[in-house]
């Protein structure tokens, strides 16, 4: 009579008297990438919950792979039971407690109050001192208010380098440039650098992962020009290894938003660099043209002995050349400098997404390693004369591989969840910044082009007097008065475009009066007064001579 239960030849493998008991407790796996955050205590409870759930699932998988296999009915029942006990995916509250904790809303507010430049010429340009006030409710700070905090640009750079490597979940905003094309001694440079650092602080304070890092507290509370990163951070890959890994095809990314985001950021990076090169070339050519315009105007000034109109016209041409030089500088200071910040930030975002690809590739390797350890353990089960020590070693390796896979899985989930949120924030910042840069570039260009028009209108009446018909005979505008010397920029609008919009008197005065009015009018008035005195003296002398001749 045969038994209804099939015979299992490996049923006695689990009765190993030398095997160590299975440990049910496990360490939390969902840790931050930097390992130095001072806010980790508040995440321990939630992370241990998620880690224990996944550890139990991992232990069940190990036991299912190496535990005894009963008959077909028992195995089917156990599989159904395991499917019912399958752990669920951790929620966003578990993965990112910094963003989901509504009870603890930590803030960090900073207001830039000044900018100082001292030291050598290189130090003044590349290492200015930023002065700011700070208020916060973070527990990592010793107090809530900080006044007149002074930090050099080099200290800001040290902080950025640490945060960019330590916090792999975030797109750490890059520092603005330490100087602008306006020149370090100009008021425009001071105002723009101050405004850019204020924008940088605003972006930094919007990221809860950054402000909760204890290195930010060390930075603000340290003395002036003494800060160096306290904690150490190590990049995933650098140097030749990083260049080699970037040549490989990126792993499959099931998150469509991030899979399409990196090519977009790279295209922004490449296009912005191309625009910078073209703007630089245009600016250089314009400055070469300015030299020719100044030489051309000086040649007319040298002809003043023939007619005073040449002197006035030459001075106007020289002033027009100077305005073209200002326009070339404004193009660089507005649009070129704006694109420079976009290039830096796009590169940092692109490298952060590349680090995520490295973690995805490490996770794939960890999954393959875990599967190989499971296959090795199953092969050990098929042998009856296997050494129990080898079985224990295989179990330990399998558990270590499963734990490594679990750590990388939670790490990737944390990075992915936070990058999806910051993707929208970065795109909105990029659109707003490029819009403001183009607006400033356009308004400055219009302003100085109108000033150039105002200068040319100064000699319009003199040039028309050179023609008996007023210089308008070939244009067919006979109704226009020959003595019209009014400027085209009025409160009613621009007469060249036919617009009749109401405008403020302040911008009209700014356009109708240029930086060269004092020089032009002073020299012209002096020339006219000297010329009139000479003319009157010659008339008296002529009259006296005529009177003497009649006697």
Curated annotation (Swiss-Prot):
Topology versus the membrane: Peripheral membrane protein
Reported modifications of this chain: Phosphorylated on one or more serine residues.
Organism, scientific name: Saccharomyces cerevisiae (strain ATCC 204508 / S288c) (Baker's yeast)
Coiled coil: 359-385
Free-text domain note: The C-terminal half, which contain the coiled-coils domains, is necessary and sufficient for interaction with VPS5.
Further comment found in the protein's record: Present with 7380 molecules/cell in log phase SD medium.
Region Disordered, annotated ranges: 1-100, 474-504
Disulfide cross-links: none
Family membership noted in the UniProt record: Belongs to the VPS17 family.
Gene Ontology terms, MF aspect: phosphatidylinositol-3-phosphate binding
Function: Component of the membrane-associated retromer complex which is essential in endosome-to-Golgi retrograde transport. The VPS5-VPS17 subcomplex may assemble onto the membrane to promote vesicle formation and is required for recycling the vacuolar protein-sorting receptor. Required for the sorting and delivery of a subset of soluble vacuolar hydrolases. Required for retention of late Golgi membrane proteins and vacuolar biogenesis. Involved in vacuolar fragmentation during hyperosmotic stress.
Compositional bias (Polar residues): 29-39, 46-64, 480-504
Start and end residues of each PX domain: 108-227
Gene Ontology terms: cellular component: cytosol; endomembrane system; endosome; retromer complex; retromer, tubulation complex
Disrupted gene: phenotype observed: Leads to hyper-fragmentation of the vacuoles upon hyperosmotic stress.
Entry-linked PANTHER family: VACUOLAR PROTEIN SORTING-ASSOCIATED PROTEIN 17
UniProt keywords, alphabetically: Coiled coil, Membrane, Phosphoprotein, Protein transport, Transport
Subunit structure and binding partners: Component of the retromer complex which consists of VPS29, VPS26, VPS35, VPS5 and VPS17. Component of a retromer subcomplex consisting of VPS5 and VPS17.
Localization terms from the record: Endomembrane system
Domain of life: Eukaryota
GO annotation (BP), single: intracellular protein transport
The protein's name in its UniProt record: Vacuolar protein sorting-associated protein 17
UniProt modified residues of type Phosphoserine: 544
Annotated InterPro entries: AH/BAR_dom_sf, PX_dom, PX_dom_sf, Retromer_complex_Vps17, VPS17, Vps17_PX
């Amino acid at each position: 009579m045969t038994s209804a239960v099939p015979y299992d030849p490996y049923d006695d493998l689990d009765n190993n008297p030398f095997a160590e008991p299975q440990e049910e407790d496990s360490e939390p796996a969902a840790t931050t990438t930097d390992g130095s955050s001072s806010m980790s205590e508040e995440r321990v409870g939630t992370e241990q919950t998620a880690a224990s759930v996944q550890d139990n699932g991992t232990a069940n998988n190990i036991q299912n792979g190496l535990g005894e296999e009963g008959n077909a009915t028992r195995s089917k029942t156990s599989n159904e039971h395991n499917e019912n006990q399958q752990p669920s995916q951790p929620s966003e509250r578990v993965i990112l407690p910094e963003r989901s904790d509504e009870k603890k809303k930590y803030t960090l507010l900073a207001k830039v109050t000044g900018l100082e430049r001292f030291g050598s010429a290189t130090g003044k340009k590349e290492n200015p001192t930023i002065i700011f006030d700070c208020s916060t409710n973070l527990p990592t700070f010793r107090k809530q208010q900080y006044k007149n905090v002074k930090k050099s640009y080099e200290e800001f750079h040290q902080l950025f380098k640490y945060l960019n490597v330590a916090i792999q979940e975030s797109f750490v905003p890059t520092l603005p440039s330490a100087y602008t094309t306006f020149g370090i001694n100009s008021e425009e440079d001071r105002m723009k650098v101050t405004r850019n650092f204020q924008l940088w602080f605003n972006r930094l304070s919007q990221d809860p992962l950054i402000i909760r890092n204890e290195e930010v507290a060390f930075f603000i509370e340290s003395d002036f020009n003494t800060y160096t990163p306290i904690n150490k951070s190590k990049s995933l890959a650098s140097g030749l290894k990083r260049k080699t890994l970037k040549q490989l095809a990126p792993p499959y990314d099931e998150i469509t938003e991030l899979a399409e985001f990196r090519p977009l950021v790279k295209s922004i990076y490449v296009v912005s660099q191309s625009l910078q090169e073209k703007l630089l070339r245009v600016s250089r050519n314009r400055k070469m043209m300015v030299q020719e315009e100044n030489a051309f105007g000086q040649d007319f000034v040298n002809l003043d002995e023939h007619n005073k109109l040449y002197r006035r016209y030459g001075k106007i041409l020289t002033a027009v050349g100077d305005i073209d030089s200002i326009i070339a500088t404004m193009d660089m200071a507005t649009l070129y400098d704006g694109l420079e910040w976009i290039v830096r930030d796009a590169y940092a975002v692109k490298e952060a997404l590349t680090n995520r690809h490295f973690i995805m590739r490490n996770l794939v390797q960890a999954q393959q390693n875990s599967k190989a350890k499971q296959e090795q353990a199953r092969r050990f089960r098929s042998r009856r004369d296997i050494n129990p020590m080898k079985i224990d070693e295989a179990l330990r390796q399998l558990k270590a591989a499963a734990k490594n896979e679990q750590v990388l899985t939670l790490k990737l989930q944390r990075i992915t969840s936070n990058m999806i949120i910051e993707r929208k924030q970065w795109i909105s910042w990029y659109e707003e910044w490029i819009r403001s840069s183009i607006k400033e570039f356009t308004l400055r260009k219009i302003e100085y082009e109108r000033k150039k028009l105002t200068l040319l209108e100064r000699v319009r009446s003199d040039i028309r007097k050179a023609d008996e018909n007023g210089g308008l005979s070939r244009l067919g505008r006979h109704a226009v008065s020959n003595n019209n010397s009014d400027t085209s920029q009025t409160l009613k609008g621009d007469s060249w475009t036919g617009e009749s919009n109401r405008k403020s008197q302040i911008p009209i005065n700014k356009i109708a009066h240029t930086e060269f009015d004092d020089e032009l009018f002073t020299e012209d008035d002096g020339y006219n007064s000297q010329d009139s005195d000479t003319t009157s003296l010659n008339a008296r002398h002529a009259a006296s001579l005529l009177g003497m001749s009649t006697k």
